[in-house]
Amino acid sequence: MRYIVALTGGIGSGKSTVANAFADLGINVIDADIIARQVVEPGAPALHAIADHFGANMIAADGTLQRRALRERIFANPEEKNWLNALLHPLIQQETQHQIQQATSPYVLWVVPLLVENSLYKKANRVLVVDVSPETQLKRTMQRDDVTREHVEQILAAQATREARLAVADDVIDNNGAPDAIASDVARLHAHYLQLASQFVSQEKP
């Protein structure tokens, strides 16, 4: 068994920056979003199933998934969203477990944007939340993705609240300041997680 630290935060909170800082310290990072993209790569069985269910227009000329079209299709249709989740979630879970087993670092950092929404925090040994104010989320996301304030507000409304994320947190990184301020927080937490992982391994041994 591997000690799992789940990392989460709302859109624009800086999850990638924090994850990269842990990766720089030699920690294996398992990213749920990357795995979600991998299971629908061209040629993947799940992609064929999506085309069969939603129609061939969901697949671009180069064989990739038309993500925006799919998002628009399921956004206002809970039944279709449930169908898609039932298809993809087991595949994502299977690949996640595979990557955890392949990990070589003392603990793994599991990056899960929808950790709270999908109650996945129960699968982790510890939860780290990257916390920023909603206003910071708005500004960063508008700048990064070149989208309107209204668009970001819709995304925020669909995600778990800041309070809900903080309620499941064991550790919190305040990322309202400059990005380079994160390094010291990550170094401190890394030392703590190494200790916890070591204790976890010694308890696991028969």
Curated annotation (Swiss-Prot):
NCBIfam families: dephospho-CoA kinase
Biological process annotations from GO: coenzyme A biosynthetic process
PANTHER family: BIFUNCTIONAL COENZYME A SYNTHASE-RELATED, DEPHOSPHO-COA KINASE-RELATED
EC number, as in UniProt: 2.7.1.24
UniProt KW Cytoplasm keyword: yes
Major subcellular site: cytoplasm
Protein name stated in the entry: Dephospho-CoA kinase
Name of the top EC class for this enzyme: transferase
Family annotation (SUPFAM superfamilies): P-loop containing nucleoside triphosphate hydrolases
Pathway where it operates: Cofactor biosynthesis; coenzyme A biosynthesis; CoA from (R)-pantothenate: step 5/5
Record InterPro entries: Depp_CoAkinase, P-loop_NTPase
Subcellular location, record wording: Cytoplasm
Subunit structure, as described in the record: Monomer. Forms homotrimers in the presence of sulfate. The trimeric form exists in solution in equilibrium with the monomeric form.
Keyword Cytoplasm: yes
Catalytic activity reported: 3'-dephospho-CoA + ATP = ADP + CoA + H(+)
DPCK domain: residues covered: 4-200
Binding site for ATP: G12, S13, G14, K15, S16, T17, R144, N175, N176, G177
Family: Belongs to the CoaE family.
Organism this protein belongs to: Escherichia coli (strain K12)
Designated gene of the protein: coaE
PROSITE patterns (alphabetical): DPCK
